[in-house]
Amino acid sequence: MASGWGITGNKGRCYDFWMDFSECMSHCREPKDCTLLREDYLECLHHSKEFQRRNRIYKEEQRKLRAASRKGEETGDGTHTHH
């Protein structure tokens, strides 16, 4: 990451985040002052927040589909016969 070159020969996608974080760390008194910049850099590298959000959306969609299918099964066509 130190060189700034990505695999395609251009600037790496997270290089700007790294430079901001690195500059903050070299000038700050407390490392916690750079926490937000660190989070931005790590999110750029790993996309963990994005994946968590996508997973929550997927689970909610699946929950709604299950609820709709259960509701459809319960209402059915209204002709429940017991023998």
Swiss-Prot record:
Belongs to the complex I NDUFS5 subunit family. It comes from the Eukaryota. A motif (Cx9C motif 1) lies at residues 14-24. CDD domains: NDUFS5-like. A motif (Cx9C motif 2) lies at residues 34-44. It is a peripheral membrane protein. PROSITE patterns: CHCH. Accessory subunit of the mitochondrial membrane respiratory chain NADH dehydrogenase (Complex I), that is believed not to be involved in catalysis. Complex I functions in the transfer of electrons from NADH to the respiratory chain. The immediate electron acceptor for the enzyme is believed to be ubiquinone. PANTHER family: NADH DEHYDROGENASE [UBIQUINONE] IRON-SULFUR PROTEIN 5 (PTHR15224), NADH DEHYDROGENASE [UBIQUINONE] IRON-SULFUR PROTEIN 5-A-RELATED (PTHR15224:SF7). This is NADH dehydrogenase [ubiquinone] iron-sulfur protein 5-B. Contains two C-X9-C motifs that are predicted to form a helix-coil-helix structure, permitting the formation of intramolecular disulfide bonds. It is found in: Mitochondrion; Mitochondrion inner membrane; Mitochondrion intermembrane space. GO terms for cellular component: cytosol; mitochondrial inner membrane; mitochondrial intermembrane space; mitochondrion. Residues 62-83 are annotated as: Disordered. It comes from Arabidopsis thaliana (Mouse-ear cress). Keywords: Disulfide bond, Electron transport, Membrane, Mitochondrion, Mitochondrion inner membrane, Respiratory chain, Transport. InterPro entries: NADH_UbQ_OxRdtase_FeS-su5. Complex I is composed of at least 49 different subunits. This is a component of the iron-sulfur (IP) fragment of the enzyme. The keyword Transport applies. Pfam families: Ndufs5. The keyword Transport applies. Residues 11-52 form the CHCH domain. Disulfide bonds join C14-C44, C24-C34.
